[in-house]
């Protein structure tokens, strides 16, 4: 199998990511994070960014092999310390209000078998060191977009029955192009129409200002409180300079932050989670008074326990997102082992930090004010998928009356 018009569609994809994703403007700095395997796409992105007037494009290359070798052989004292040059680079990007484009294509199991203690220590150290960048991103001080590219090892996991490596990669690129609307006659217009539909759902939810959400499904009975003056967001966002951008491509979600002090019940994951180079399945979480009191996983149990119990703020939630089961990604029937895609096939929750934009006036609040408003503060943010065609969700008003939001996994409003 050879994907028809691949080069033409890859060029369209690069243009969409640069012009509509991060929305590069004259004078901008762009930081591109991308795997060495995606050299062709990287070059197209760099070319397009400079064509739109970028003053500097910084490419941060990633390599699964190099990363795995580091974790296998580097001593713990090196892994749990972040080098000064990385912090200096972060500060440079922040000072220049650099837009960030992350293109994900890694093998979901690249770090399988690596010492969980090393992974946990490194992730914790990076989370603390990169906190200023995370805060800037989660409060939309800068434009940022997360997208994907078809990596070989990733493609082989998604399409294990493909006739060849080439076919697996082609099949994955085909799904990326479909979900990002590259095959549409006018991808930009298609994105505008899609964003308008999601925005209408967010506006309805913002008008209601529910006090809580109640989720029920096999293995799930969970009530999440919502902060006062919470904000539901959808596809598009606006940075501190007043420039629009698309944080996720693809996207099917409408999301906000729960009140991290108000979560009671239990929830079971419905899709695998790829986190820290490990595939985690069968997650079960129990909450009391907003806190995770028990978490288990059928696969990757220790990785999840380390995430929750070894990172500040990781015992509470920072995001709840609504995604209808009939979404195109869900209906494809494909498990992507990639959060960007799998979270857009399913209702999901995020362990850890909330976005400052999830409450009115949040971007002007201090960390202490955000916490007082009910937004979780943490050095991590990890989504896990809980939706299915058997999930019902009710919005609960202040007076206790209920409004059906989801029935059998789809919008009821």
Residues of each region from the PLM?
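Short solvent-exposed loop/turn micro-motifs enriched in small/polar/acidic residues
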Residues: 15, 206-208, 276-279, 313, ...
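Short linear motifs in exposed loops
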Residues: 225, 295-296, 406
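Active-site lining segments that contact anionic ligands and/or coordinate catalytic metals
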Residues: 262-264, 280-282, 289-292, 315-319, ...
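A short secondary-structure junction signal
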Residues: 112-115, 155-160, 236-237, 278-281, ...
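Extended hydrophobic packing segments that form well-structured cores
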Residues: 368-413
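Active-site bordering "gate/hinge" segments
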Residues: 1-264, 395, 401-403, 411-413
């Amino acid at each position: 199998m050879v994907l028809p018009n691949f080069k033409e569609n890859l060029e369209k994809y690069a243009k969409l990511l640069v012009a509509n994703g991060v929305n590069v403007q004259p004078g901008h700095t762009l930081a591109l994070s991308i795997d060495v395997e995606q050299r062709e796409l990287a070059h197209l992105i760099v070319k397009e960014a400079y064509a739109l007037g970028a003053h500097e494009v910084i490419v941060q290359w990633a390599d699964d092999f190099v990363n795995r070798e580091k974790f296998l052989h580097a001593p713990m004292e090196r892994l749990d310390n972040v080098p000064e040059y990385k912090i200096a680079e972060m500060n440079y990007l922040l000072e220049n209000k650099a837009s960030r484009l992350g293109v994900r294509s890694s093998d979901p199991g690249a770090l399988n078998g690596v010492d969980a203690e090393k992974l946990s220590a490194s992730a914790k150290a990076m989370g603390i060191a990169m906190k200023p960048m995370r805060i800037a991103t989660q409060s939309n001080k800068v434009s940022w977009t997360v997208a994907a590219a078809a990596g070989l090892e990733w493609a082989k996991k998604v399409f294990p029955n493909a006739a060849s490596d080439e076919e697996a990669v082609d099949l994955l690129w085909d799904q990326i192009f479909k979900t990002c609307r590259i095959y549409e006659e006018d991808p930009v217009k298609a994105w505008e129409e899609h964003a308008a539909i999601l925005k209408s759902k967010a506006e309805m939810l913002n008008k209601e200002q529910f006090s809580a959400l109640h989720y029920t499904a096999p293995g799930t009975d969970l009530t999440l409180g919502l902060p006062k003056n919470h904000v539901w967001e959808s596809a598009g966002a606006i940075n501190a300079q007043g420039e629009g951008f698309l944080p996720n491509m693809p996207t099917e979600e409408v999301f906000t932050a729960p009140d991290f002090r108000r979560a009671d019940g239990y929830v079971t994951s419905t899709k695998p989670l790829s986190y820290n180079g490990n595939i985690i399945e069968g997650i079960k979480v129990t909450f009391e008074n907003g806190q995770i009191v028990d978490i288990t996983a059928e696969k990757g149990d220790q990785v999840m326990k380390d995430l929750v119990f070894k990172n500040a703020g990781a015992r509470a939630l920072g995001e709840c997102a609504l995604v209808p089961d009939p979404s195109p990604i869900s209906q494809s029937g494909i498990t992507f082992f990639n959060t960007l895609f799998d979270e857009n096939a399913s209702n999901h929750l995020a362990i850890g930090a909330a976005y400052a934009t999830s409450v009115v006036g949040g971007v002007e609040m201090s960390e202490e004010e955000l916490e007082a408003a009910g937004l979780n503060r943490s050095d991590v943010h990890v989504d896990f998928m809980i939706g299915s065609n058997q999930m019902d969700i009710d919005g609960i008003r202040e007076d206790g009356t209920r409004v059906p939001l989801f029935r059998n996994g789809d919008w009821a409003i």
